[in-house]
């Protein structure tokens, strides 16, 4: 019996693993708590994943239902336009069979057009002198030329620069019917010459004088300057400098006089104030 019991015990230990129901081990409470939390998180995660999938499916269905339907494209019918057929020009026949040309709908037809129809309907055997009517310049062309010349004279471009003569185009009609236009040449204005001379004052300041000269009105004076010798030119410059110096001295004197007048006026005002104070006391 002892041998049988030992054999049965050894067989049970060798064939039964520790993970079987015969082997039990007490788990740590923290381990059990962690396992419970992990199981809860997994179930919660699967729940939210399922909710997300359902929401995405609903959104896709709503988007598909909201897609606008493509409207039917209108049918465009293109009707070809009839091509106008050119009418051949009539051929002049002898007077016996020549058809009488009738003018079209009466519009503003001038006397020249009536002369032209009369000439076409005349006999081809007539002399050349009778075929050519007396041609006069058209009133319409004359009116256009007159209006053009009038507009050329009346047009003045707005500008803030000094007035200058602009080239005016004049058109005339020749005896042969041609129109010729002429434009005179206008010399552009030269820019004005500006010179500034600064002179030091005895008090340490500087007085500057600016002079401006426009060479266009006196083109002859510019030519005279070009023809002057160097000696005459230097003497003229010295004369101008002396004149400018005299004007500068006058300006300085006027400044001194103004200062003296101001000082005396202030003294008079102070004396009046003191006298008024004494009168009040």
Curated annotation (Swiss-Prot):
Classification via Pfam families: Orthopox_A5L
Record localization: Virion; Host endoplasmic reticulum-Golgi intermediate compartment membrane
Keywords: Host membrane, Membrane, Virion
Basic and acidic residues: bias regions: 24-33
Biased composition (Low complexity): 155-175
PTM note: Its phosphorylation state is regulated by the OPG054 kinase and the OPG106 phosphatase.
Signal peptide: none
Main location (coarse class): virion
Entry protein name: 39kDa core protein OPG130
Species assigned in the record: Monkeypox virus
């Amino acid at each position: 019996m002892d041998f049988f019991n030992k054999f049965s015990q050894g067989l049970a230990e060798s064939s039964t693993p520790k993970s079987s129901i015969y082997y039990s081990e007490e788990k740590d409470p923290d381990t059990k708590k962690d396992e419970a939390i992990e199981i809860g998180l997994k179930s919660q995660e699967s729940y939210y994943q399922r909710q997300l999938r359902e929401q995405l499916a609903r959104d896709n269905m709503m988007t598909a239902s909201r897609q606008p339907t493509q409207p039917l494209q209108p049918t465009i019918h293109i009707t070809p336009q009839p091509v106008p057929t050119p009418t051949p020009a009539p051929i002049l026949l002898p007077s016996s069979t020549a058809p009488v040309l009738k003018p079209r709908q009466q519009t503003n037809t001038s006397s020249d057009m009536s002369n032209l129809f009369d000439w076409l309907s005349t006999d081809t055997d007539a002399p050349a002198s009778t075929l050519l009517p007396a041609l006069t310049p058209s009133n319409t062309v004359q009116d256009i030329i007159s209006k053009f010349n009038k507009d050329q004279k009346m047009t003045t471009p707005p500008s803030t620069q000094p007035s200058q003569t602009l080239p005016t185009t004049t058109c005339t009609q020749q005896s042969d019917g041609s129109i010729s236009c002429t434009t005179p040449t206008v010399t552009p204005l030269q820019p004005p010459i500006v010179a500034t001379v600064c002179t030091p004052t005895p008090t340490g300041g500087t007085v500057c004088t600016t002079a401006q000269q426009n060479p266009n009105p006196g083109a002859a004076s510019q030519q005279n300057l070009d023809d002057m010798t160097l000696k005459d030119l230097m003497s003229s410059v010295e004369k101008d400098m002396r004149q400018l110096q005299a004007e500068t001295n006058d300006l300085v004197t006027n400044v001194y006089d103004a200062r003296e007048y101001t000082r005396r006026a202030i003294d008079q005002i102070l004396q009046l104030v003191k006298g008024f104070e004494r009168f009040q006391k």
